Amino acid sequence: MRTPIIAGNWKLHMNPEQTVEFVNAVKGKLPDPSKVESVIAAPAVDLYVLKKAAEGSDLHTGAENAYFEVEGAFTGETSPKVLNEMGIDYCIIGHSERRGYFHETDEDINKKAKALFANGVTPIICCGESLETREANKQEDWVVAQIKAALDGLTAEQVSKLVIAYEPIWAIGTGKTASADQAEEMCKTIRETVKDLYNEETAENVRIQYGGSVKPANVKELMSKPDIDGGLVGGASLDPESFLALVNYQD
């Protein structure tokens, strides 16, 4: 049985003081982690206080990016080794904003996934198509290619532990949401791709999130779908009450 996982992606929002206020507002009201896993992925400058504030609570922590080298002359990058030393649980890689603005390639994302696993941090690997690709009805081919590239060289055991986030680019921060049926169709395709690459057990274990304008008003419908195991949430994760409504969607 896959444990649902709702992860907030704060992007370039929140300072350390706001981070502590947020955690204090939510930490006593989170669901049992055996029922729903609650995660906040914060900017690197907030991670230390996020982890400290979340200690003793059911809030898991995540980074928004990491490099594929653990140390060296890589100005401005984040070390997966240091994330592990800080006790950070997850790291988002391959987000469309990283791919688009910072020209990250499928090869980069694959190297990052391997580096994170080598350093004991669980990757949340993002994939998703543009509006142009969807209108050409090539969304499945696009996402399957992204998944194959991202998972190249990973073991079945590793893949069964990671999280894949399907985020159609046209639905991120636009207010447009893929319908629950569209989201389910693509998450099912991702699961079938994992089955083809590995085996049925691995495909049944991997958790697949939907991301793209997820909010309290649509989370229940999305989470009712058999192949959607969670949400990767942007704007709706910045407000404590909104985040609590998302993670407590089963209530």
Curated annotation (Swiss-Prot):
* Chain positions recorded as substrate binding sites: N9, W10, K11, G173, S213, G234, G235
Q: Write down the chemical reaction(s) this protein catalyses.
A: D-glyceraldehyde 3-phosphate = dihydroxyacetone phosphate
Reply yes or no: does the keyword Membrane apply.
no
User: What are the record keywords, sorted?
Assistant: Cytoplasm, Gluconeogenesis, Glycolysis, Isomerase
- State the Gene Ontology terms under molecular function: triose-phosphate isomerase activity
Q: Where is the signal peptide?
A: none
Entry's Gene Ontology BP terms: gluconeogenesis; glyceraldehyde-3-phosphate biosynthetic process; glycerol catabolic process; glycolytic process
Cellular component terms (Gene Ontology): cytosol
Protein function: Involved in the gluconeogenesis. Catalyzes stereospecifically the conversion of dihydroxyacetone phosphate (DHAP) to D-glyceraldehyde-3-phosphate (G3P).
Oligomeric state and interaction partners are given as: Homodimer.
What protein name applies here?
Triosephosphate isomerase
- Where does this protein come from, organism-wise? Lactobacillus gasseri (strain ATCC 33323 / DSM 20243 / BCRC 14619 / CIP 102991 / JCM 1131 / KCTC 3163 / NCIMB 11718 / NCTC 13722 / AM63)
Upper lineage is: Bacteria, Bacillati, Bacillota, Bacilli, Lactobacillales
